[in-house]
Design a protein with these regions (language model features):
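Conserved nucleotide-sugar donor-binding catalytic segment
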Residues: 2-85
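Residues that form generic nucleotide/phosphate-binding pockets
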Residues: 14, 95-98, 165
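A general structural signal for well-ordered secondary-structure junctions
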Residues: 39, 61-62, 105, 126, ...
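Catalytic core of nucleotide-sugar-dependent glycosyltransferases
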Residues: 67-75, 80-107, 126-138
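Structural register within alpha-helical repeat arrays
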Residues: 109, 113-116
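Membrane-interface aromatic/basic loop that binds lipid-linked glycans or pyrophosphate carriers
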Residues: 125-177
Length: 177
């Protein structure tokens, strides 16, 4: 609930469909970074996801119900607007072992897999898109999201433009819940 404050029992489950933490709104002791590692420079997008997997798998995560940052989706030149084909993403295979013993981590990563699969499909990289989609445990993704994945590319592009227009005008929603 929005008024909860304290330790989260399961960071990955709580972060679906939206992450409970953003890099600009967190406090992490330096000793945690020294043990888990810092951001990986080889990843140009998704460094925070990789970092949170390493941290939340080993340490408790607490949240506050106080607003400490705002995320502005409409910033035109933000890193998140970089086309997927120009990004160096996480290799999800790095987390295979942890996923096998942590179903909520698997679901969390499957949400990123379908997001990237959709982006690759929209970008015309159907081979990469299909590769990611095959690695998803289907019950981890809502039926509507799976159905959207199978829409033709031109329809996905049109729907994305509608979503961007709505978001810019204050209507935010997710296809992941």
């Amino acid at each position: 609930s929005a008024d909860y404050e304290g330790i989260i029992s399961d960071y990955f489950k709580t972060s679906l469909p939206y992450p409970v933490a953003t890099s600009s709104s967190i406090v992490i002791p330096k000793s945690v970074f020294e043990k888990t590692g810092y951001f990986k420079p080889a990843i140009s997008s998704g460094q925070d996801v990789d970092m949170w997997i390493r941290i939340a798998s080993k340490y408790p995560v607490a949240i506050s119900n106080k607003v400490t940052a705002s995320y502005l989706h409409y910033i035109e030149d933000s890193l998140s607007k970089t086309p997927i084909l120009d990004k160096k993403l996480n290799d999800f295979k790095d987390y295979k072992q942890e996923e096998e013993s942590n179903p909520s981590l698997k679901k969390y990563l499957d949400t990123y897999r379908i997001e990237y699969a959709l982006q690759y499909k929209i970008a015309g990289a159907s081979k990469k898109s299909k590769e990611l989609f095959k690695s998803i445990l289907k019950e981890n993704i809502p039926l509507k999201t799976r159905l959207i994945y199978f829409l033709p590319r031109f329809v996905l592009i049109f729907l994305l433009k509608i979503k961007q227009f709505l978001r810019k005008n204050g209507f935010n929603f997710s296809i992941y819940n």
